[in-house]
Amino acid sequence: MQLNHPIRQALLSVSDKSGIVEFAQGLVRRGVKLLSTGGTAKLLAENGIPVTEVSDYTGFPEMMEGRVKTLHPKIHGGILGRRGIDDEVMMQHQIDAIDMVVVNLYPFAATVAKPDCTLEDAVENIDIGGPTMVRSAAKNHQHVAIVVNNSDFNAILAEMDQNRNSLTLETRFDLAIKAFEHTAQYDSMIANYFGQMVKPYFRAEEEAEAKCGQFPRTLNLNFIRKQSMRYGENGHQKAAFYVEQDVKEASVSTAKQLQGKALSYNNIADTDAALECVKSFSEPACVIVKHANPCGVALGKDILEAYNRAYQTDPTSAFGGIIAFNRELDEDTAKAIIERQFVEVIIAPTVSSAAQEIVKSKKNVRLLMCGNWESAIQRLDFKRVNGGLLVQEADLSMVDLADLEVVSKRQPTKQELEDLLFCWKVAKFVKSNAIVYAKNNQTVGIGAGQMSRVYSAKIAGIKAKDEGLEVKGCVMASDAFFPFRDGIDAAAKVGIECVIHPGGSMRDQEVIDAANEHNMVMVLTKMRHFRH
């Protein structure tokens, strides 16, 4: 069986037309005849490229406003025909072999992402002929090359030059895998969209039903492997890093690594925690993370001051940590980090060339640049359980000054309000039960992950004492309500003067009374931030 077949005829029909003119020109220069449809054929002709319209080839016009273009035996026979097996049938019906199919699909995802998208808009952007051709060509990859990614154009032309206008079976097989991945992702998007639409569309008057409709009945997820890893969370666990396509928001998954060793499983998890936390602040900020928990967070007039203050919270835990900034990493800050501590990862929106030169002296330090960000984009969070998947909206909500309810007799000062909001933002990113002490926009002690809220508070106090930081006059944030007054009594003993928490306990009044007895400020957010 001949494994490499010269490409003599190609069918081009694309929605994303970037690079298609140059690719078509390259095919023509190599003697390939072109078939095409609608807008693609028009674009090629306008650029002086010889092309035959599919409707002229089949003798059957496009119809139903473009719904039927390529669904014809002369097209699919040419794609599916097995060389050496179906030749006689193809000759009998005057079907020419199609050796390459270049297709990408209607922009369904972009259409449904529009705020004003109607169900009719979505329906008209469901591609039928495209996926059919893609699957046909991928099925017959022994004889046909299927191209769904514009990024493959140059490599394909280069290989054709090396192989007498043909592609190897290995290449065609790889292209077929990409094609099946492409159609699977496309169908998943459609299924997810309609799955979450069905209840609100048909029962819009039933609010509860509409809420159920936010999540599809069947959830189809598509992620692309970005990186294989030496191991996972522990040395005996195999692992890989998968990412979503077309992520618009600055994130660890889209960050560019400027230097250093490959990111490990734990590096990625910790860097994500650090970056998402530092994105909460508009002022120059630094977040230092260890084992997915912030161990030091601070604001400053610039990121150097923010880093120095964040490091001061817990220098011991900062060793081997992850450092994130919300401003460009500059030379002075990079120098301070490299001279002071061992660090696994540094991530910032941008990195100055001078800072990059400084970090080069520590070649193993992973330096990442994630780009700037604006407001957070709503997304889903997933948590795997044995035999299932918990799905929820990502916790992107945050209160501001107008949302706070002061329930104590004593009113907070302007600085205390600033510190309370700062402390509350940090607590959101600390594993529950979370207690954070802060003063002047700097964490003083962080207690994370304890089964008892009181013990988290004790740990925060111990950490502050160990580093010589004064708790007296600090504010305290708790990610969830205080079920009893004991947490407030303990806080008062160490000098906490203001407390922020969600409220909502059956004993809220008892807790408020405790704050008043100690002349403390108590502020309720009415929003919880559990983190497990």
Curated annotation (Swiss-Prot):
Signal peptide: none
Pathway: Purine metabolism; IMP biosynthesis via de novo pathway; 5-formamido-1-(5-phospho-D-ribosyl)imidazole-4-carboxamide from 5-amino-1-(5-phospho-D-ribosyl)imidazole-4-carboxamide (10-formyl THF route): step 1/1; Purine metabolism; IMP biosynthesis via de novo pathway; IMP from 5-formamido-1-(5-phospho-D-ribosyl)imidazole-4-carboxamide: step 1/1
E.C. number: 2.1.2.3, 3.5.4.10
GO molecular-function terms, A-Z: IMP cyclohydrolase activity; phosphoribosylaminoimidazolecarboxamide formyltransferase activity
SUPFAM superfamilies associated with the record: Cytidine deaminase-like, Methylglyoxal synthase-like
Gene Ontology CC terms: cytosol
Reactions this protein catalyses: (6R)-10-formyltetrahydrofolate + 5-amino-1-(5-phospho-beta-D-ribosyl)imidazole-4-carboxamide = 5-formamido-1-(5-phospho-D-ribosyl)imidazole-4-carboxamide + (6S)-5,6,7,8-tetrahydrofolate; IMP + H2O = 5-formamido-1-(5-phospho-D-ribosyl)imidazole-4-carboxamide
Domain MGS-like intervals: 1-148
Pfam families reported for this sequence: AICARFT_IMPCHas, MGS
CDD domains with a match to the protein in the record: IMPCH
PANTHER family: BIFUNCTIONAL PURINE BIOSYNTHESIS PROTEIN ATIC, BIFUNCTIONAL PURINE BIOSYNTHESIS PROTEIN PURH
Family: Belongs to the PurH family.
Name of the featured protein: Bifunctional purine biosynthesis protein PurH
Organism (species): Histophilus somni (strain 2336)
